[in-house]
A protein has these predicted regions:
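Positively charged n-region of N-terminal signal peptides that target proteins for export
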Residues: 1-6
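Bacterial N-terminal signal peptides
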Residues: 7-19
Length: 222
């Protein structure tokens, strides 16, 4: 019996450490909505919004793309006002972990960022990415205008026609309304916490797989 309990506890600890969840050092009850760039340096850039699983992973992926100037982790797609990480974790806010991507349209376009989205996660799994499950991890491609909506719809139709994936795409195509910036400790999480078990086991391998498949759109290594 003790052996079974030991195995159970070991497995539980491993599961918790290998999921996109941490006990926050300090919970911010009301994250600031990011309707405009926090820095005037970003005002000249366009924005795009994507949800494709744990935002620690997604932020790092988009940060690696040429033409992307900044990526902010946050929450979007739901109805709860000023959600925090604890609320998001319940899966009942309607929001998904989302990234806000600031990009230079003279260097990279929206369609390329959309290709990054579909090429860096599994859009056929409903409410799940890797070890993370719940509506907060669902796949969403947000659009801010009719042009972006058509680009997304056409791209999904193309992927479906070419049978790129073995199963139907379940990505939501959703109008962007408001984006809430996540707590500060989530920003640049992968970069600042390279030894975190989830980062080592899930985030970094996911980033490296993306880089290996898409060397032509990456920033030059410094």
């Amino acid at each position: 019996m003790k052996t079974l309990i030991t195995y159970f506890l070991t497995g539980l600890i491993y599961l918790l450490m290998s999921s996109c969840h941490i006990a926050p050092p300090k919970m911010i009850d009301n994250p600031t909505p990011v309707g405009v760039p926090n820095s005037t340096d970003l005002q000249e850039y366009k924005t795009a919004y994507f949800a494709s699983g744990c935002f620690w992973c997604v932020e790092a992926i988009y940060e690696s793309v040429y033409g992307v100037e900044e990526v902010i982790s946050g929450y979007a797609g739901g109805t709860t006002v000023n959600p925090n990480y604890q609320q998001i974790g319940t899966g009942r806010t309607g929001h998904a972990e989302t990234v806000e991507v600031y990009y230079d349209p003279s260097k990279v376009d929206f369609k390329t960022l959309l290709a990054v989205f579909f090429n860096s996660h599994d859009p056929t799994t409903k409410n799940r990415q890797g070890p993370d499950s719940g509506t907060q991890y669902r796949s969403i491609a947000f659009y801010s205008n009719d042009t972006e909506k058509k680009i997304i719809e056409d791209y999904v139709a193309e992927l479906t026609r070419d049978q790129v994936f073995d199963k139907p795409i379940v990505t939501e195509i959703k109008q962007h309304t408001i984006f809430y910036k996540a707590e500060e400790y989530h920003q640049d999480f992968e970069k600042l916490n390279p030894l975190h078990p989830y980062v080592r086991q899930i985030s970094i391998p996911r980033l490296n797989r993306f880089k290996a498949k898409n060397p032509e759109i990456l920033k030059e290594s410094k």
